């Protein structure tokens, strides 16, 4: 990929994260006069760039998804540790992020180790700027996805558990369950030799070609609902979080990328599949 695309994309990713950080730092606790949100944002990007170095040297993508998941866990822990006044809402947010990140990170790491490689990275891992752009965008992904949770956890405004927290928790459980079940169903399907060179249309996959992504979108909406009541003023910029997740999964890296690869592999069979692209379109 041309440097005319990769370098500006890297800079734009950093700029976007910086602008959102400036917005949601209002009302956030500070460390030595500096908003904890800024520390979290910097930590996220530095973690990606640190692991990018050996990954590029050894041309491996094996630790890409794992690094992202560990970053979710560690930066949320950082926010919890440096926020003095922690509420039950904060604990719920952190717990849900940790459960999701640990489950997905371990699942993806085991999958790539088992497969030996991830086809998404075949070309980009050999191109310094393209690969760096990908790691930087992951940093943006982590920060924007976590924006609602981080803004709420680090906020000086605290509230008792309310209807938003209850409904948000139920939505998170629903979305997380769909993602876990969908991933397990696909794993079981691919482990069956009789299904070689076939695409899955059983279980949740008979309703959608991407139920796992649907579940992920839903669970982050749940987290946004839990976090919403304690946000004030410019912290509401964090509402970009679930919108960003939905846009990214449906238009950039998730559904769009897999649909493109799917059409190349299975062609017109996808058109005759009973499964729509997404549960939201069924």
What do these predicted regions represent?
Residues 1-12:
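N-terminal membrane topogenic signal
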Residues 20-39, 77-95, 146-168, 225-238:
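Helix-coil boundary and interhelical linker segments in multi-pass alpha-helical membrane proteins
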Residues 43-54, 71-76:
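Central hydrophobic cores of alpha-helical transmembrane segments in multi-pass inner-membrane proteins
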Residues 47-53, 98-114, 144, 170-189, ...:
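Transmembrane alpha-helical segments that form the membrane-embedded catalytic/substrate-channel core
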Residues 57-156:
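Intramembrane catalytic core of multi-pass membrane enzymes that act on lipidic substrates
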Residues 110-126, 184-203, 258-273:
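Cytosolic, membrane-interface loops and tails of multi-pass inner-membrane proteins
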Residues 128-133, 197-206, 214:
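Alpha-helical membrane-protein architecture signal
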Residues 271-282:
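Single conserved hydrophobic/aromatic residue that forms the stacking wall/gate
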């Amino acid at each position: 990929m041309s440097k005319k695309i990769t370098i500006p994309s890297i800079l734009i990713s950093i700029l976007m994260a910086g602008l959102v950080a400036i917005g949601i730092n209002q009302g956030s606790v500070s460390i030595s006069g500096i908003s904890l949100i800024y520390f979290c944002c910097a930590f996220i990007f530095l973690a990606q760039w640190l692991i990018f170095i050996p990954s590029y040297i050894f041309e491996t993508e094996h630790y890409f998804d794992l690094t992202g998941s560990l970053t979710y866990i560690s930066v949320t822990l950082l926010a919890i540790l440096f926020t003095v006044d922690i509420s039950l809402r904060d604990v719920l947010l952190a717990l849900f992020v940790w459960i999701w990140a640990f489950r997905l990170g371990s699942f993806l790491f085991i999958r790539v180790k088992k497969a030996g490689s991830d086809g998404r990275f075949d070309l980009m891992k050999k191109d310094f700027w393209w690969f760096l752009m990908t790691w930087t965008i992951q940093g943006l992904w982590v920060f924007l996805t976590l924006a609602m949770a981080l803004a709420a956890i680090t906020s000086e405004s605290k509230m008792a558990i309310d209807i938003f927290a209850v409904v948000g928790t139920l939505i998170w459980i629903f979305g997380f369950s769909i993602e876990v079940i969908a991933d397990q169903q696909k794993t079981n399907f691919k482990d069956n030799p009789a299904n070689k060179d076939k695409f899955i249309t059983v279980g949740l996959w008979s309703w959608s070609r991407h139920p796992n992504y649907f579940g992920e979108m839903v669970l982050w909406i749940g987290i946004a609902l839990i976090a919403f009541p304690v946000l004030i003023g410019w912290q509401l910029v964090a509402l970009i979080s679930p919108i960003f997740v939905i846009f990214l999964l449906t238009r950039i890296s998730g559904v769009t990328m897999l649909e493109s690869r799917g059409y190349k592999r299975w062609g017109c069979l996808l058109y005759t599949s009973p499964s729509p692209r997404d549960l939201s379109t069924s």
